[in-house]
Amino acid sequence: MRAIAINDYGTPATLTELPKPEPGPGEVLVRVRASSINGFDAAVAAGMLKGMMEHRFPVVLGKDFAGTVEAVGEGASRFVAGDAVFGVVMKPFLGDGGLGEYLVVGEQHGIARIPEGLDLQAAGALGLAGTAAVNAIDAVAPTTGEDVLISGATGGVGAIALQYAVAAGAEVIATARPGAEADFVHGLGAAHVVDYTSDLAAQVRAIAPEGVPAIVHLAGEAEQLAGLLAAGGRIASTLGFGPDQHPAAVAVMADPNPVTLDRLAADAASGALRVPITRTYPLEGTPQALADFTAGSLGKLAITV
């Protein structure tokens, strides 16, 4: 099978021919049709997870996947061949990924069916970013009329979190540079845009003099953001900023359980959630997609497998 893999720590991600995997007990074999680029993938490709997770080289990149079940292993019963599925690769080691034509995953976690109305490309860009966004918004639990500051609103997680905050009735203050970034977040429903390259605190205080009740920290300096909280406010961070650093902080780890994946898929299928794909690349274009992601990109960069 064709796959995008690295052969050692920090070596370039290249298109490689690898054996087709076989499902073991409780596993399903997915013919992958779509994936996307996440910060995790870029970190793995750069060798940044050396010593943090076991690497089984060649390491196929890609946390996200969407495709069709081709076969099931012994004892697997949630899915049958032909089911359209999507999800997040959740294994205790790095080696198997969604940026290959075939993928074996456990059937109990990190995988769900794709409903009618959701195409494979969108599903392939939804899993990890969508899960992180839902978990972060659930952690701060915005209510109608509340100001919510989303720092990192222009990325994949931020663009989805922004939409869920708006759906909850919140007034979203989104960080974005003037121009294309500001237009992007306004298009997703942001009520206010603050330029993170300027005096962020002054801009936020001009909108919310008493501070903001809720903050989603996806980028930027967490301590500076925490200083913008209103009394009794809460901050959710996907970057490790938690209660050890601030009593109002919750460190969020994306948990792609079937309930969350089903929620994301249903919202995307109904049109309530827009999967914010801004560019699509072929599998062999993944190295360019990684470079574009690292340089700074809007929304999600999708990969057709």
Residues covered by each model-derived region:
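C-terminal hydrophobic helical "lid"/dimerization subdomain
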Residues: 1, 261-305
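Residues located in well-ordered beta-strands
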Residues: 2, 14, 31, 66-68, ...
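Glycine-rich beta-strand-centered segment in the early N-terminal region that forms part
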Residues: 19-37, 49-91
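NAD(P)H dinucleotide-binding glycine-rich loop of Rossmann-like/cofactor-binding domains
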Residues: 54, 78, 88-152
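Mid-domain Rossmann-like dinucleotide-binding core that forms the NAD(H)/NADP(H) cofactor-binding site
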Residues: 123-198
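Glycine-rich cofactor phosphate-binding loops and adjacent beta1-alpha1 units
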Residues: 183-251
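Rossmann-fold dehydrogenase core element
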Residues: 232-276
